[in-house]
């Protein structure tokens, strides 16, 4: 479980970025949304110790992040940065994915097994000898996820994962998230992509001006006035609202809802 207890944070004294944030998240898929500058990335970087609270505490499976290293926490919470290139430094895809497990001190045989599983999970089997920097944007995003998967964390934090991806790349990402959910992985996804939120999220955390504006069920979230927070409703939500239906995830659900 990830527990946030009365957390405050500032980069500059007197200008808090996060103000008394409290919440708990156990499993499933949590979307973290809000306007630019609302504190989203600052908050989720606390989940694996990249940033420490100024006040309050963040506990990950009972471990206070103030008392643990990022290396220790990375076994529980993996972080995929918005720009995957920032994560890469090896010359082959295999060595890139193997880097984390090797640092854990695993045998080379177990490292190979983890790399094989992670690459298959993200659809990059056969890419082992390719140069990470020569992959497409979507392939780089999948490789970044594979690098984290190979560490076998309980939670994966994805920071704006659809940025720069075309429709095909976004579709592949959604499939990966759904498949890994079935295998027991949980996700925290920072995003402006409301279609992604509608299709995959269980819960939504809405931040604005460093404060929690909403934390709860995804369908309840889409009943809010999102324009107030400079967020764009998915077309499907607009249609549901227009005909007096509660939000649904797919066109198929919409058709069933109107009896077709």
From Swiss-Prot:
Keyword line: ATP-binding, Cell membrane, Membrane, Nucleotide-binding, Translocase, Transport
Highest taxon, organism lineage: Archaea
GO molecular function: ATP binding; ATP hydrolysis activity; ATPase-coupled transmembrane transporter activity
Binding site for ATP: 34-41
Compartment(s): Cell membrane
Keyword Transport: yes
Gene3D superfamilies referenced in this protein's UniProt entry, alphabetically: P-loop containing nucleotide triphosphate hydrolases (3.40.50.300)
Xref: InterPro entries: AAA+_ATPase (IPR003593), ABC_transporter-like_ATP-bd (IPR003439), ABC_transporter-like_CS (IPR017871), ABC_transpr_CbiO/EcfA_su (IPR015856), ECF_ABC_transporter_ATP-bd (IPR050095), P-loop_NTPase (IPR027417)
Protein name: Putative ABC transporter ATP-binding protein PF0068
Organism expressing this protein natively: Pyrococcus furiosus (strain ATCC 43587 / DSM 3638 / JCM 8422 / Vc1)
Upper lineage: Archaea, Methanobacteriati, Methanobacteriota, Thermococci, Thermococcales
